[in-house]
Amino acid sequence: MISFQQKILNLIKCFRRQWPLFSNSERTTVCGADRMLTALQLSMAEVNKQHHGDFAVSPSDVMETWKYLLHDKLGLSYENMEEPENYAAFKEAYHTFLASSNMLDIIDIYQKCCALALLSEDERIAPIQLLEFISGAMNVSESNGSVLPSTPVNRQDQSSVKVMLFAKNCFYSYLSLLVNSKDDLALACILNVPDRGLGREAFTKLKHASRERKMSIFLMATSFIRTVEHGGKGCAASLFDPLRVHVKELSNFINFIDKLGEIVGEIPDPRVAGGQILSTVKMHLMKGQSNGDPFYQAVEKVVQDLDLKIKNIIDSQHEVLTASTTGVSPTRPKLHSINHGTAYCGRDTIKVLLVLLDEEAVSAPTQNKAELLYDDVNLNMFGITSVLTLFRSPAQSKESSPKPSRQRIQKPVNEKIIKMKRSSIKSQFACTYKNELSKIRSQHFLSSSQVPACMHPAPKQHLQGKYFTEGMNSCLDIPVLGTISENVHQNRNYREMGKLSCQPRNKNSKNEQMDLNNDNVIHDEESETSLPKNAKKLKTSNNPQKELDSKIGGKRKNNRTASKNKLIVGQAKLTQFFKL
């Protein structure tokens, strides 16, 4: 008669043969009873954090929801059970966690196999039997050669069992992460085993970064290290990346996993490759340990047990293959099997490791659920943080740095640049000018939007007086400040540009000129008649080299040139004095 564990293992074998019907990846791992409970605990804590702000959940609530979830998924009656609060959110978060970790639990595989009718009569399992097995109510005899004693006698035996469980969990976590790079539970167990300096702070930063990029934690760490090591200037990691503090530690961890992957890809024999993988992990865990340490001895026993299991798996596979292919020529592998998920030379090793992990998934669940859920005391013996404590990482603070560091650094730099920037020198006495000159100009001069567009009517056009009262002749664009404020040092270009005017002139009209020694303005008869009576008159000078033309074209293309040539009161006299 087939044992119950063997029936569940046959379910998983059926899943491996028809994996495209179940999952998108051949490397999908099976979540056993203990890991199902741990995943539910983390999912409930995450939902509680969203609703109440605290990443925590009581053991009684976990066990109540666990019992209700098993009945719900197996389709069993739960009339006498009350639905837990936020059960729908707990269930959704649980399935989301498994999907993001590329895992399927035993119940999902069972339901899929039953729906597809992939089981024979002898392999069928009743839902109530599966419920009793997962919940731990069924008495299951361990017949897979486990190194763990069934009933520890005294405290010393209990301590040795805890050490053995911890060592076994470390090995299976390394193998699971090697096969399934999305397994966040496996990563949390071995990220800092042995001590690499990647404690809770590093795990917190990795978790936040992985959620921002919607990647698994291990793939996020791998992507960061690859960017640091091989990225050029264009794709280098940011200087303000919080993971830069842990570059060395993360690099050591990623390089070790890469070393295990190289063993899988380079050694074609799965027996040799499996033994070398176990030996590499063993030497890695034993660093700093002496022969008399309990952990050292536990690692030795676990390696021997796993090595024996790998050999038994390979032998059983050869027996099945020999029995099924007797007298039949070997066929070529299917097209989708080649290079699907791994290099072809390492496929046999990966398949052996998957079978090893599947056998561990069907092992009997832990009887002491409280010890499984809250194992802080047990893990403190090895200086390890529990999975729940790791995932209880606080949210990143946003109050200490409201703006990015680059903006906070750039702001004072820009302020210094603004202080150092000065206006261009307008004359040799510009350093003696007051800062109120710009205010005076803004008060006495009109902007380009305030001055109407230049027209070309008849020479004698009457303009509105309000433009003159504000200090500007809209036609000739002559500013009136009460005194002459024109620059004497104009070159020929400015004189030529000043010949433009808003109104057309007659060829016989006289040019307006300025006399620096007089305060009166004279005109010719034509220009005088075009001005209103209340406008101030300008006086011209007979010296053409000191000519100042304040008339700018209607399109005001030379507005900047005119603004640079404006002088304050008394500057023209000082300039003439120093010329003498």
UniProtKB/Swiss-Prot annotation:
<dbReference type="GO" id="GO:0003677">
    <property type="term" value="F:DNA binding"/>
</dbReference>
<comment type="function">
    <text>Required to suppress inappropriate homologous recombination, thereby playing a central role DNA repair and in the maintenance of genomic stability.</text>
</comment>
<protein>
    <recommendedName>
        <fullName>PCNA-interacting partner</fullName>
    </recommendedName>
</protein>
<keyword id="KW-0539">Nucleus</keyword>
<dbReference type="GO" id="GO:0000785">
    <property type="term" value="C:chromatin"/>
</dbReference>
<comment type="similarity">
    <text>Belongs to the PARI family.</text>
</comment>
<dbReference type="GO" id="GO:0005634">
    <property type="term" value="C:nucleus"/>
</dbReference>
<keyword id="KW-0227">DNA damage</keyword>
<keyword id="KW-0238">DNA-binding</keyword>
<feature type="region of interest" description="Disordered">
    <location>
        <begin position="525"/>
        <end position="565"/>
    </location>
</feature>
<dbReference type="InterPro" id="IPR027417">
    <property type="entry name" value="P-loop_NTPase"/>
</dbReference>
<dbReference type="GO" id="GO:2000042">
    <property type="term" value="P:negative regulation of double-strand break repair via homologous recombination"/>
</dbReference>
<keyword id="KW-0234">DNA repair</keyword>
<keyword id="KW-0963">Cytoplasm</keyword>
<dbReference type="GO" id="GO:0006281">
    <property type="term" value="P:DNA repair"/>
</dbReference>
<dbReference type="GO" id="GO:0005737">
    <property type="term" value="C:cytoplasm"/>
</dbReference>
<dbReference type="InterPro" id="IPR038932">
    <property type="entry name" value="PARPBP"/>
</dbReference>
